[in-house]
Amino acid sequence: MGKKCEKINGDLTVILVYMNGDLRYTCGGKVDLCMDKPVFKRKIYDEIYEWKENRSDKYALLIKGARRVGKSTIAEEFAKKEFKSYILIDFAHTSKAIIDLFDDTYDLDFFFLQLQQLMGIRLYEKESVIIFDEVQLFPKARQAIKYLVADGRYKYIETGSLLSIKKNTKDILIPSEEHKISMFPMDFEEFLWAIGDEVSAETIRHLIKNKKPAGNAMHRNLMRIFRLYMLVGGMPQAIETYIEKNNLQLVDETKREIVDLYEEDFVKIEPVLLEIFMMPYLLILVVMHQDIFCQVQERGFALRR
């Protein structure tokens, strides 16, 4: 795969990606295609596919969830696999030229013409999707969904972080033409897929269905894998760090960075509520500390006896 990045009109970056001799484009500040990041198998893919087959003519898809659970990644992965072409507009990084297009969406013919020209991507009626990534950062784009869906030429996927997407609706008319689905961190089975374990989940299902005991050796092995999942967690970035580095300390640092982002989001919403929002995290840390302290005391007492 060949990759090349070019500047067009000053601040607009177009990443040119050559795959098997074919030219692919993306832009708006998203550079994931130039990073060779892994894309994990997610169960929500089937929900998105159901929307495409049965609802996309009348509704845009809104994928909502906490930050860093993989919303943007799964949206783009789905667009690559299920559509002839796609445009991804990342409102966290996109250019002013793209933002200005939403000042006038009454003439949609001209709107789409300009969008294709600026992005360097051709759209095909009924076969292309436009992704509004981090749509909570630009509510005007979300409001435009009503008219874009009614136009019927293309499909639309929006992604938004839970906290901000609920807050940033004060000055807009929330479109009813949205089919909402929630995305969460990776569950145990998705974690197994990510680490290349295609056996354990089926084994557990078989044991439960047939009400059979696992046996000591199998039980120990399954519990070892489950404890690993509990240590790494379900955030894709943390799992990626574990797979690449095999270092739990680095995994913890990655998770700490994610929690820091959450804290920053809480402050943006309402600084005085930060303590309330963070209380569950603090309680977890207190309970974990007490549990570890009690275990150490009990073991010390047993040794003295």
Task: Give residue ranges: language-model regions.
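Hydrophobic anchor at the beta1->P-loop junction of P-loop NTPases
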Residues: I63
